[in-house]
C-alpha cells in the first residue's frame, strides 16, 4: 500500500509542538466511515510515537461524539462552532492542558475628581437585586478583549459614560466561583470619565448616578463585607493619596508578533512607554 492509499484510510491531522496531533473535521461523515478511519489513525499515531490527540468536530458532526468516546476520547470543551475531544495514547502521564480554568471580570472605579464623586449603579438582576446597594459597574471580559477594553465597554454599556483607562488598582482571585467550578479573577480598574451625562442600560440597570465617594464607601454593605470594604478603601485612598499607584498598561508584542499588554507599576510603565524603541539598558 502506497502513502496515498494509506492516507485515504486515515483521518488527516497536523502535528502540534508537543508531540501531539490536531484533527479538524468539518465535513459530514457517517459513523460507518468515521470509526474505521479513527481506529486505523490511532494505530498509526501510536506507532509514530504520538502522545495526545485533539479531535475537533465542527457543529453538525455531533453524530461522531459517541463513537469517538467509545474509542477512548473524552470531551475537553465545547463552543458554539465545535466540540473538542482529546485522547492520550502515550504510555506516560498525560500532559494535555485542562479546559480553561478561569473567568476574567472587571469592575470600574470611575472618578470625577472635580466633584469627588464616583459612578455607581443598581442592577435589575443578580446578587444585589433588591438590596438597595449602589455598586461599581462590573462585567466579564469577552473572548479576545483586553482587560482595560472590557472595563471601558461595560461602563459605556451600563451607564452611557465614555471613559479612558487609567490603572488597574487591584485584583481579586476567588476559586470555585463561576458555576461553582471555575476560578474568577476580578480586576478593579480606575477609569477617567470623558462624558458625564448618564444614560442607563434599561435591560440590566435599575438606576445609575454619581455618588460622593465617602457615601459610597460608607454604605452598610461595604462596611459589613470585608472584601467590599477593602476595595472601597482602595478607591478612597486613590482619591485621597494619589501616591497610591496601581498598574498601567504597556503595549508590546509577543515572540510571535501578536500585540499584547503588559501591566506594571505606573511609574515604570510611563518609563517604558517613553523609552520605547531605545536599546535596552540595565538598571
Curated annotation (Swiss-Prot):
InterPro entries: NUDIX_hydrolase-like_dom_sf (IPR015797), Nudix_hydrolase6-like (IPR003293), NUDIX_hydrolase_CS (IPR020084), NUDIX_hydrolase_dom (IPR000086), Pre-Nudix (IPR040618). One of its GO terms (molecular function) is NAD binding. GO terms for biological process: positive regulation of salicylic acid mediated signaling pathway; response to other organism. Expressed in stems and leaves. Weakly or not expressed in roots. Keywords: Hydrolase, Magnesium, Manganese, Metal-binding, NAD. Its EC number is 3.6.1.-, 3.6.1.13, 3.6.1.22. A divalent metal cation binds at residues 154, 158, 204. Residues 101-233 form the Nudix hydrolase domain. One of its GO terms (cellular component) is cytosol. Divalent metal cations. Mg(2+) or Mn(2+). It is an enzyme of class 3 (hydrolase). Its cofactor is Mg(2+); Mn(2+). A motif (Nudix box) lies at residues 139-160. This is Nudix hydrolase 6. It comes from Arabidopsis thaliana (Mouse-ear cress).
Amino acid at each position: 500500500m502506497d502513502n496515498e492509499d494509506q492516507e485515504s484510510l486515515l483521518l488527516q491531522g497536523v502535528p502540534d509542538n508537543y508531540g501531539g496531533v490536531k484533527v479538524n473535521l468539518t465535513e459530514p461523515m457517517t459513523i460507518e466511515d468515521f470509526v474505521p478511519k479513527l481506529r486505523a489513525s490511532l494505530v498509526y499515531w501510536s506507532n509514530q510515537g504520538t502522545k495526545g490527540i485533539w479531535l475537533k468536530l465542527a457543529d453538525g458532526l455531533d453524530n461522531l461524539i459517541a463513537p469517538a468516546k467509545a474509542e477512548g476520547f473524552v470531551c475537553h470543551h465545547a463552543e458554539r462552532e465545535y466540540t473538542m475531544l482529546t485522547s492520550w495514547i502515550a504510555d506516560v502521564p498525560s500532559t494535555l492542558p485542562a479546559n480553561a480554568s478561569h473567568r476574567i471580570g472587571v469592575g470600574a472605579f470611575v472618578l470625577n475628581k472635580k466633584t469627588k464623586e464616583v459612578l455607581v449603579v443598581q442592577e435589575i438582576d443578580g446578587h444585589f437585586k433588591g438590596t438597595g446597594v449602589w455598586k461599581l459597574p462590573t462585567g466579564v471580559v469577552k473572548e479576545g478583549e483586553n482587560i482595560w477594553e472590557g472595563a471601558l465597554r461595560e461602563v459605556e454599556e451600563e451607564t452611557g459614560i465614555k471613559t479612558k483607562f487609567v490603572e488597574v488598582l487591584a485584583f481579586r482571585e476567588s476559586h470555585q466561583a463561576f458555576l461553582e467550578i471555575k476560578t474568577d479573577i476580578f480586576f478593579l480598574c480606575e477609569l477617567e470619565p470623558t462624558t458625564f451625562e448618564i444614560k442607563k442600560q434599561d435591560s440590566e440597570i435599575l438606576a445609575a448616578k454619581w455618588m460622593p465617594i465617602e457615601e459610597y464607601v460608607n454604605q452598610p454593605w461595604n462596611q459589613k463585607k470585608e472584601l467590599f470594604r477593602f476595595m472601597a478603601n482602595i478607591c478612597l485612598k486613590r482619591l485621597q493619596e494619589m501616591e497610591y499607584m496601581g498598574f498601567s498598561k504597556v503595549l508590546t508584542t509577543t515572540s510571535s508578533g501578536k500585540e499584547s499588554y503588559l501591566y506594571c507599576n505606573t511609574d515604570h510603565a510611563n518609563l517604558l512607554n517613553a523609552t520605547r524603541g531605545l536599546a535596552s539598558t540595565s538598571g
